[in-house]
């Protein structure tokens, strides 16, 4: 079931990211952070009074938005852009203001935009960390957005009141969708890369164009089909555009809609335009897929329009591998949705990835691999004068694959050594198109069997 989305908007330096971090706490998913995949995490789940929802820091979605040195006019424009994105995509909007600066014109302009929308708005007056400042929060009644909630995102005071108000405005909970056991594939990518064309080619029929109704939201479009005996649900974000989806003539990602599609899917297919090449937005969304621990494939569309004499398949494959270097295990396929060239190959790839995500490695096999890896490249860290030791490993779960490693000092295992072990696992067992998660835990030495052969 899709979780409601709560978007935080506001000018630079009002405390959006501080509030975001306070509300989501420490993210539990354990994956490797690598430069170039995502910026600071912009979204995370939280639960309050039994309701689970996704919090989004819209400043993180729009590059450069939290630069306090921007000219005032640019700050206003970008804050408007944040607000419009939230109006387009979120279920509840948290509008953050700064009590220390008081009510300023930039806040009033954004408030006017929010009042014209049909979305519920919760007004958070931040940096109210003294009694006088809490009293000054009443000034923000003038924004016409209801009761201002005085809080200090840094200290956490008032955050409970804010969460109460957020939950009060969340849409009514929906019944859990019946599990149809189909393979759920999300087709994501920038506008005009051919998402609709690919979907139409796969299902063999023209899709109805979704009407653009200002002020409303729609769930992603689901299309069901069967391919090689496997039931498949295609989750399509194509055609879903809002009045706010065009900014100075350049269409931007429907980022929050893409997040919902990624949340629901097993496998995400990121479509890249062969003529334009991959963009920072494409790598950003790929990072979102990896953050969610979903399967990933890179699909390069419009390959029929490329002059192969000037830009060969090998050249294109090298370029894509370099851009998506943080996911070297993700398959890359070149297609033409328009002509149908290799279009159904994407379904074969998705089925392969799903099989890889459900692959299990026996405990004896993973420990044989660990012994060999430690023998060839021992960990060099020290713990209380003793060498770091890895005793034992086992696969804990599938979809995504999770491996547990037991050590005398799990916190001392270096990121580089974790990557080494991941590479050894992939060399031996593949795990094409899926993140694998390595978790290191402590265990008393006498309770384990040492794979290093030493006691």
Swiss-Prot record:
Pfam families: KH_dom-like, MMR_HSR1. GTP 2 binds at residues 189-196, 236-240, 301-304. Residues 359-444 form the KH-like domain. The keyword Nucleotide-binding applies. GO terms for biological process: ribosome biogenesis. One of its GO terms (molecular function) is GTP binding. Residues 4-174, 183-358 form the EngA-type G domain. Keywords: GTP-binding, Nucleotide-binding, Repeat, Ribosome biogenesis. It comes from the Bacteria. Disulfide bonds: none annotated. GTP 1 binds at residues 10-17, 57-61, 126-129. GTPase that plays an essential role in the late steps of ribosome biogenesis. Belongs to the TRAFAC class TrmE-Era-EngA-EngB-Septin-like GTPase superfamily. EngA (Der) GTPase family. Associates with the 50S ribosomal subunit. This is GTPase Der. The lineage of its organism: Bacteria, Bacillati, Chloroflexota, Chloroflexia, Herpetosiphonales.
